[in-house]
């Protein structure tokens, strides 16, 4: 065995030699500070760069309850790498968490992100974070911190992973938990912008089988752009709706589709019966169904099928809620009703 080289004979190593570029990390921070600054709102104490981010809960809350959520973008990132398209996945990241905490009535207050890669590409990372900031602006929350982890050997060059963390607040007396949902209530469906951020393992399998030209026109934009459309953020229109109407329950339609997410807000003994003809199946989902040979039941269990958020209100409030959401720029339909469950029946059925 050769003895180890003595320190005087060995060439000195640096962090850069090990694959970590501190200068690139500093350059990224400089690039993203203006994006984060645009998201600042009341409650933010201090700026980016501290060990911890500080936020003061708004004084309008008498009994504030903090609501937190965390999520990623899933294998939609694999398609982003393939297309070298990184400007929309940041909004996806924010949407997945803020829409989740919104369903309990929470106003998103702040957001943090985690960006992990093997080798940091400053331009790519800055593009992603700009999208995160855009999402935060749409949600009305502050991007108050984050972590960029350059970890040589952990990820292939050109690839990265994302995680996001949102914290919001709701008045204790106004928490929405589905406990008041009753027979006869109406289920409203708000349109999605596309696939959002779930089901992309199946999407990628369908693309592999169909081998389409992703640059080809698809209803006025490229198929690639249709597939990568960022997840819609429903925060502002739904917070406004909650100010005027008693929203009984909401479900963010993510992994599991309509049939597995709506039951999360229903009490035992209740079923949401959805009419699949009450809203149009968007062309992109028709394309996926056709080229993947995907059964209807599987479509409803994997994809949002055009509905990104379900909102449950009383029958008396349904028309008013429809009107308010439409006035706020949302496409919305009455997609079903709540009734008593039949023996052995699932809590959400699509007929």
Curated annotation (Swiss-Prot):
GO terms for biological process: 'de novo' IMP biosynthetic process; adenine biosynthetic process. GO terms for cellular component: cytosol. Disulfide bonds: none annotated. InterPro entries: PurM-like_C_dom (IPR010918), PurM-like_C_sf (IPR036676), PurM-like_N (IPR016188), PurM-like_N_sf (IPR036921), PurM_cligase (IPR004733). Pathway: Purine metabolism; IMP biosynthesis via de novo pathway; 5-amino-1-(5-phospho-D-ribosyl)imidazole from N(2)-formyl-N(1)-(5-phospho-D-ribosyl)glycinamide: step 2/2. GO terms for molecular function: ATP binding; phosphoribosylamine-glycine ligase activity; phosphoribosylformylglycinamidine cyclo-ligase activity. SUPFAM superfamilies: PurM C-terminal domain-like, PurM N-terminal domain-like. It is found in: Cytoplasm. Its main location: cytoplasm. Keywords: ATP-binding, Cytoplasm, Ligase, Nucleotide-binding, Purine biosynthesis. The keyword Lipid biosynthesis does not apply. It is an enzyme of class 6 (ligase). Its EC number is 6.3.3.1. It catalyses: 2-formamido-N(1)-(5-O-phospho-beta-D-ribosyl)acetamidine + ATP = 5-amino-1-(5-phospho-beta-D-ribosyl)imidazole + ADP + phosphate + H(+). Belongs to the AIR synthase family. This is Phosphoribosylformylglycinamidine cyclo-ligase. The gene is purM.
């Amino acid at each position: 065995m050769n003895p180890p080289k003595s320190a005087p004979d060995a060439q000195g190593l640096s962090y850069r030699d090990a694959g970590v570029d501190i200068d690139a990390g500093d350059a990224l921070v400089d690039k993203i500070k203006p994006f984060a600054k645009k998201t600042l709102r009341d409650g933010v104490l201090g700026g980016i760069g501290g060990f911890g981010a500080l936020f003061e809960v708004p004084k309008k809350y008498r009994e504030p309850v903090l609501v937190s959520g965390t999520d990623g973008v899933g294998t939609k990132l694999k398609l982003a790498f393939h297309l070298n398209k990184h400007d929309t996945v940041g909004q996806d990241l924010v949407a997945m968490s803020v829409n989740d905490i919104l369903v309990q009535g929470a106003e998103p207050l702040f957001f943090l992100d985690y960006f992990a890669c093997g080798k940091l590409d400053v331009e790519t990372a800055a593009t992603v974070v700009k999208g995160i900031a855009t999402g935060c602006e749409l949600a009305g929350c502050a991007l108050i911190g984050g972590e960029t982890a350059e970890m040589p050997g952990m990820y292939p060059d050109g690839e990265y992973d994302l995680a996001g963390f949102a914290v919001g607040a709701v008045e204790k007396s106004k928490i929405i938990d589905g406990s008041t949902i009753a027979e006869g209530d109406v289920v409203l469906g708000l349109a999605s912008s596309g696939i959002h951020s779930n089901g992309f393992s199946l999407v990628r399998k369908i693309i592999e089988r169909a081998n389409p030209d992703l640059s080809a026109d698809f209803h006025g934009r490229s198929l690639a752009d249709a597939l990568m459309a960022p997840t819609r953020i429903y925060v502002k229109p739904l917070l406004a709706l909650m100010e005027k109407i008693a929203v009984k329950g909401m479900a963010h339609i993510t992994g599991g589709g309509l049939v597995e997410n709506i039951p999360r807000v229903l009490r035992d003994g209740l079923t949401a019966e959805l009419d699949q003809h009450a809203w149009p199946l968007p062309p992109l989902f028709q394309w996926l169904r056709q080229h993947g040979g995907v059964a209807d039941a599987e479509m409803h269990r994997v994809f949002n099928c055009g509905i990104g958020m379900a909102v449950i209100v009383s029958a008396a409030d349904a028309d008013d809620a429809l009107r308010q959401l439409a006035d706020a720029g949302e496409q919305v339909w009455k997609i079903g009703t709540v009734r008593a469950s039949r023996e052995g029946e699932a809590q959400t059925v699509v007929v």
